């Protein structure tokens, strides 16, 4: 295990994936829906730590789950995408019998099953951790991305945690427009909205793929273009969970909000602001009992303009 700190541990962050818009463009013969979306990553993140495991732990890579949203996942760690990613990577690299035991600790700070790709981001972070831990084992980029697709359509975009245009069922990635350093607020009302139910409830119509510029010079230009687009799952999710509509109304009324919309299939909603500090300043106007609220900037951007 490569560990420049000498502590025997490695760390990765798994950032929230936000769909700034999401068009359902069609449906494949196998029933999977085709999408066009612009995904960005917020500063909000889960944290994964990889450390040496115990000889008798039973599996080459074991998983512990903690954090504010970890309790709901502890009962079913065996099916967690983090462990699935570890198992598939071991098989793909063909090193199963040569691995020292390791343990991943997932600190779950993001709401579960909430439209922000948390499980997919965790799986991608696990892949990055293990590839750092096994530096002598080469894995071509194409094979890594193919493995990511097998884990889930959102996992490929989470590998690099960079803004990207998503197509196909989500696995086809293309460069995103250059983004301004905007602020973002995320709100989750604490109510689960199953993705299959949202797709079943949506109107049976399709929306063409969007036409985007190569760059947005400022937040105003970005908001004007995004306002002309939609999240095609938002209305259906609001019918299933009316609190989402309340969240959107509260966000839209927040001081400095430029755009409010639902991410993915919900229930997390986001609002865009002129700056990260502007988003943080508006938090007190949005916070409600039982709501998870985060405010800041986009991952990879300066914290302030």
Swiss-Prot record:
Q: Which gene encodes it?
A: ispE
Q: Which reaction does it catalyse?
A: 4-CDP-2-C-methyl-D-erythritol + ATP = 4-CDP-2-C-methyl-D-erythritol 2-phosphate + ADP + H(+)
What name does the UniProt record give this protein?
A: 4-diphosphocytidyl-2-C-methyl-D-erythritol kinase
EC number, UniProt record? 2.7.1.148
Q: What SUPFAM superfamilies does its record include?
A: GHMP Kinase, C-terminal domain, Ribosomal protein S5 domain 2-like
Q: Per the UniProt entry, what are the Gene Ontology biological process annotations, in alphabetical order?
A: isopentenyl diphosphate biosynthetic process, methylerythritol 4-phosphate pathway; terpenoid biosynthetic process
Pathway involvement of the protein, from the record? Isoprenoid biosynthesis; isopentenyl diphosphate biosynthesis via DXP pathway; isopentenyl diphosphate from 1-deoxy-D-xylulose 5-phosphate: step 3/6
Q: Name the keywords, alphabetized.
A: ATP-binding, Isoprene biosynthesis, Kinase, Nucleotide-binding, Transferase
Residues that coordinate or bind ATP:
111-121
């Amino acid at each position: 295990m490569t560990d420049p700190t000498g502590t025997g541990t490695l760390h990765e962050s798994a950032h929230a994936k936000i769909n700034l818009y999401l068009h359902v463009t069609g449906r494949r013969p196998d029933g999977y829906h085709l999408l066009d979306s612009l995904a960005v990553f917020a500063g909000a993140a889960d944290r994964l730590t990889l450390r040496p495991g115990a000889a008798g732990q039973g599996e080459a890579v074991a998983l512990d789950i903690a954090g504010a949203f970890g309790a709901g996942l502890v009962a079913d760690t065996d099916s967690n995408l983090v462990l699935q990613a570890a198992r598939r990577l071991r098989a793909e690299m063909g090193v199963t019998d040569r691995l020292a035991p390791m343990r991943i600790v997932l600190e779950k700070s993001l709401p579960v099953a909430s439209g922000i790709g948390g499980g997919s981001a965790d799986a991608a972070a696990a892949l990055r951790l293990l590839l750092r831990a096994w530096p002598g084992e080469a894995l071509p980029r194409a094979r890594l991305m193919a493995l990511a697709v097998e884990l889930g359509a959102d996992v490929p975009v989470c590998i690099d945690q960079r803004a990207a245009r998503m197509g196909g069922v989500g696995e086809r990635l293309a460069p995103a427009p250059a983004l301004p350093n905007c602020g973002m607020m995320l709100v989750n009302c604490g109510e689960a909205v199953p993705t299959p139910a949202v797709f079943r409830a949506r109107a049976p119509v399709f929306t063409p793929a969007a036409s985007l510029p190569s760059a947005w010079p400022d937040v105003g230009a970005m908001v004007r273009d995004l306002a002309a687009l939609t999240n095609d799952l938002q209305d259906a999710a609001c019918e299933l969970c009316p609190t989402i509509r309340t969240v959107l109304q509260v966000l839209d009324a927040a001081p400095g909000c430029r755009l409010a919309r639902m991410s993915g299939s919900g229930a997390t909603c986001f609002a865009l602001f002129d700056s990260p500090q502007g988003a943080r300043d508006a938090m007190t106007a949005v916070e409600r009992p039982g709501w998870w609220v985060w405010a800041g900037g986009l991952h990879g951007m300066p914290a302030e303009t």
